Amino acid sequence: FNKKISNNNLSKINKDIEIDFSNIIAPLSENLKNFKLIGKIEKGKFTKISAKGGFGENNFLDITMKQDKKNKKKYLEIYSDLTRPLLTEYNFFKGVTGGKLFYSSIIDGDNYNSKLKIENFNLINAPAMVKLLSLADLSGLADLAEGEGLSFDVLEIKMEKKENILILSEILALGPSISLLMDGYTSPEVTSLRGTLVPAKTLNKMIS
Protein backbone atom coordinates (compact mmCIF):
# COMPACT_ATOMS: atom_id res chain seq x y z
CA PHE A 1 0.00 0.00 0.00
CA ASN A 2 2.79 2.43 0.95
CA LYS A 3 4.66 1.46 -2.21
CA LYS A 4 1.62 2.34 -4.32
CA ILE A 5 1.37 5.72 -2.63
CA SER A 6 5.08 6.33 -3.23
CA ASN A 7 4.78 5.42 -6.92
CA ASN A 8 1.75 7.67 -7.31
CA ASN A 9 3.63 10.57 -5.76
CA LEU A 10 6.62 10.03 -8.06
CA SER A 11 4.38 9.94 -11.13
CA LYS A 12 3.27 13.49 -10.32
CA ILE A 13 6.79 14.94 -10.46
CA ASN A 14 7.40 17.19 -13.47
CA LYS A 15 10.42 19.45 -13.24
CA ASP A 16 13.87 20.37 -14.51
CA ILE A 17 16.68 19.32 -12.19
CA GLU A 18 20.35 20.07 -11.75
CA ILE A 19 22.68 17.92 -9.63
CA ASP A 20 26.25 18.74 -8.67
CA PHE A 21 28.46 16.35 -6.66
CA SER A 22 32.08 17.21 -5.91
CA ASN A 23 33.00 13.59 -5.15
CA ILE A 24 31.26 10.23 -5.67
CA ILE A 25 32.84 6.99 -4.44
CA ALA A 26 32.48 4.60 -7.36
CA PRO A 27 33.11 0.82 -7.27
CA LEU A 28 36.74 -0.33 -7.01
CA SER A 29 37.69 2.93 -5.25
CA GLU A 30 37.50 4.92 -8.49
CA ASN A 31 36.27 8.30 -7.28
CA LEU A 32 34.12 10.28 -9.69
CA LYS A 33 34.78 13.98 -9.19
CA ASN A 34 32.89 17.11 -10.20
CA PHE A 35 29.89 15.14 -11.45
CA LYS A 36 27.23 17.44 -12.86
CA LEU A 37 23.85 16.40 -14.20
CA ILE A 38 21.20 18.48 -15.90
CA GLY A 39 17.95 16.69 -16.61
CA LYS A 40 14.21 16.80 -17.03
CA ILE A 41 11.66 14.64 -15.23
CA GLU A 42 8.15 14.07 -16.59
CA LYS A 43 5.61 11.98 -14.68
CA GLY A 44 8.34 10.78 -12.34
CA LYS A 45 10.74 9.55 -15.03
CA PHE A 46 13.77 11.08 -16.71
CA THR A 47 13.12 12.23 -20.27
CA LYS A 48 16.37 14.13 -20.70
CA ILE A 49 19.85 13.78 -19.16
CA SER A 50 23.15 15.49 -19.78
CA ALA A 51 25.86 14.53 -17.29
CA LYS A 52 29.63 14.57 -17.00
CA GLY A 53 32.25 13.75 -14.39
CA GLY A 54 35.94 12.94 -14.14
CA PHE A 55 37.93 10.03 -12.68
CA GLY A 56 41.18 12.01 -12.79
CA GLU A 57 44.18 11.78 -15.12
CA ASN A 58 42.06 12.89 -18.10
CA ASN A 59 39.57 10.03 -17.65
CA PHE A 60 35.95 11.12 -18.02
CA LEU A 61 32.39 9.81 -17.88
CA ASP A 62 29.72 11.28 -20.18
CA ILE A 63 26.02 10.40 -20.13
CA THR A 64 23.28 11.71 -22.42
CA MET A 65 19.65 10.69 -22.82
CA LYS A 66 16.84 12.14 -24.92
CA GLN A 67 13.26 11.10 -25.51
CA ASP A 68 11.52 11.19 -28.87
CA LYS A 69 8.26 13.04 -28.31
CA LYS A 70 6.48 11.10 -31.07
CA ASN A 71 7.28 7.46 -30.31
CA LYS A 72 8.21 8.01 -26.62
CA LYS A 73 11.39 5.96 -27.03
CA LYS A 74 14.45 7.05 -25.07
CA TYR A 75 17.94 7.19 -26.55
CA LEU A 76 20.75 6.69 -24.03
CA GLU A 77 24.49 7.06 -24.68
CA ILE A 78 27.34 6.50 -22.20
CA TYR A 79 31.06 7.02 -22.73
CA SER A 80 33.70 6.24 -20.12
CA ASP A 81 37.49 6.30 -20.21
CA LEU A 82 37.40 3.66 -17.44
CA THR A 83 35.43 0.43 -17.79
CA ARG A 84 35.71 -1.31 -14.42
CA PRO A 85 33.60 1.11 -12.31
CA LEU A 86 30.69 0.59 -14.71
CA LEU A 87 31.03 -3.18 -15.17
CA THR A 88 32.05 -4.45 -11.74
CA GLU A 89 28.49 -5.46 -10.79
CA TYR A 90 28.19 -7.81 -13.78
CA ASN A 91 29.77 -11.28 -13.49
CA PHE A 92 29.81 -11.55 -17.28
CA PHE A 93 32.55 -8.88 -17.39
CA LYS A 94 34.62 -10.18 -14.50
CA GLY A 95 38.31 -9.90 -15.35
CA VAL A 96 38.00 -6.99 -17.78
CA THR A 97 40.60 -4.29 -17.07
CA GLY A 98 41.58 -1.15 -18.93
CA GLY A 99 39.92 0.04 -22.11
CA LYS A 100 37.36 2.64 -23.07
CA LEU A 101 33.62 2.01 -23.01
CA PHE A 102 30.89 3.12 -25.41
CA TYR A 103 27.26 2.20 -24.73
CA SER A 104 24.11 3.13 -26.63
CA SER A 105 20.56 1.99 -25.99
CA ILE A 106 17.08 2.52 -27.40
CA ILE A 107 14.65 2.16 -24.50
CA ASP A 108 11.00 1.36 -25.18
CA GLY A 109 9.18 1.01 -21.88
CA ASP A 110 10.69 -1.96 -20.02
CA ASN A 111 12.42 -3.30 -23.14
CA TYR A 112 15.56 -2.07 -24.86
CA ASN A 113 17.99 -2.66 -27.72
CA SER A 114 21.59 -1.89 -26.84
CA LYS A 115 25.14 -1.92 -28.18
CA LEU A 116 28.23 -2.09 -25.98
CA LYS A 117 31.73 -1.51 -27.28
CA ILE A 118 34.99 -1.74 -25.31
CA GLU A 119 38.29 -0.88 -26.96
CA ASN A 120 41.84 -1.89 -26.03
CA PHE A 121 41.30 -3.91 -22.86
CA ASN A 122 42.79 -6.91 -21.06
CA LEU A 123 41.07 -9.99 -19.69
CA ILE A 124 42.87 -11.14 -16.55
CA ASN A 125 42.02 -14.15 -14.36
CA ALA A 126 38.51 -14.49 -15.79
CA PRO A 127 37.21 -17.94 -14.66
CA ALA A 128 34.75 -18.32 -17.55
CA MET A 129 37.39 -17.57 -20.18
CA VAL A 130 40.00 -19.84 -18.55
CA LYS A 131 37.50 -22.72 -18.51
CA LEU A 132 36.55 -22.08 -22.13
CA LEU A 133 40.18 -22.09 -23.29
CA SER A 134 40.94 -25.24 -21.32
CA LEU A 135 37.97 -27.08 -22.84
CA ALA A 136 39.16 -26.00 -26.29
CA ASP A 137 42.57 -27.57 -25.54
CA LEU A 138 44.28 -24.17 -25.60
CA SER A 139 46.16 -24.61 -22.35
CA GLY A 140 48.83 -22.06 -23.26
CA LEU A 141 46.26 -19.32 -23.69
CA ALA A 142 44.46 -20.50 -20.55
CA ASP A 143 47.67 -20.07 -18.56
CA LEU A 144 48.12 -16.61 -20.08
CA ALA A 145 44.56 -15.66 -19.15
CA GLU A 146 45.27 -16.63 -15.54
CA GLY A 147 48.59 -14.74 -15.47
CA GLU A 148 49.37 -11.65 -17.53
CA GLY A 149 45.99 -11.72 -19.21
CA LEU A 150 44.76 -11.73 -22.80
CA SER A 151 44.65 -8.45 -24.67
CA PHE A 152 41.82 -7.52 -27.03
CA ASP A 153 41.51 -4.71 -29.55
CA VAL A 154 37.74 -4.54 -29.37
CA LEU A 155 34.67 -6.18 -27.84
CA GLU A 156 31.24 -5.50 -29.35
CA ILE A 157 27.99 -6.81 -27.88
CA LYS A 158 24.53 -6.39 -29.36
CA MET A 159 21.76 -7.16 -26.90
CA GLU A 160 18.01 -6.96 -26.55
CA LYS A 161 15.98 -7.16 -23.35
CA LYS A 162 12.48 -8.60 -23.43
CA GLU A 163 10.74 -9.14 -20.10
CA ASN A 164 13.28 -10.97 -17.90
CA ILE A 165 15.42 -12.35 -20.74
CA LEU A 166 18.49 -10.60 -22.13
CA ILE A 167 19.16 -11.81 -25.68
CA LEU A 168 22.80 -11.50 -26.75
CA SER A 169 22.44 -11.48 -30.52
CA GLU A 170 26.15 -10.97 -31.15
CA ILE A 171 29.32 -10.99 -29.05
CA LEU A 172 32.44 -10.22 -31.07
CA ALA A 173 35.91 -9.98 -29.51
CA LEU A 174 39.05 -9.45 -31.58
CA GLY A 175 42.57 -9.72 -30.18
CA PRO A 176 46.14 -10.53 -31.23
CA SER A 177 46.05 -13.96 -29.52
CA ILE A 178 42.45 -15.05 -29.97
CA SER A 179 39.10 -13.97 -31.45
CA LEU A 180 35.57 -14.88 -30.39
CA LEU A 181 32.16 -14.78 -32.02
CA MET A 182 29.23 -15.84 -29.84
CA ASP A 183 25.53 -15.40 -29.20
CA GLY A 184 23.14 -16.53 -26.50
CA TYR A 185 20.90 -15.31 -23.73
CA THR A 186 20.85 -14.77 -20.00
CA SER A 187 18.02 -14.79 -17.48
CA PRO A 188 17.79 -14.84 -13.67
CA GLU A 189 17.90 -18.65 -13.84
CA VAL A 190 20.47 -19.47 -16.53
CA THR A 191 23.06 -18.12 -18.95
CA SER A 192 23.55 -19.87 -22.30
CA LEU A 193 26.24 -18.98 -24.85
CA ARG A 194 27.45 -20.63 -28.04
CA GLY A 195 29.89 -19.62 -30.73
CA THR A 196 33.32 -19.88 -32.30
CA LEU A 197 36.75 -19.39 -30.76
CA VAL A 198 39.69 -18.90 -33.14
CA PRO A 199 43.35 -18.72 -32.00
CA ALA A 200 45.40 -16.13 -33.88
CA LYS A 201 47.76 -18.77 -35.32
CA THR A 202 44.80 -20.61 -36.84
CA LEU A 203 43.42 -17.38 -38.27
CA ASN A 204 46.80 -16.52 -39.78
CA LYS A 205 46.96 -19.93 -41.50
CA MET A 206 43.49 -19.39 -42.96
CA ILE A 207 44.43 -15.96 -44.32
CA SER A 208 47.91 -16.83 -45.66
Give, region by region, the residue ranges found by the protein language model:
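Membrane-proximal interfacial segments on either side of biological membranes
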Residues: F1-I171, G175-S208
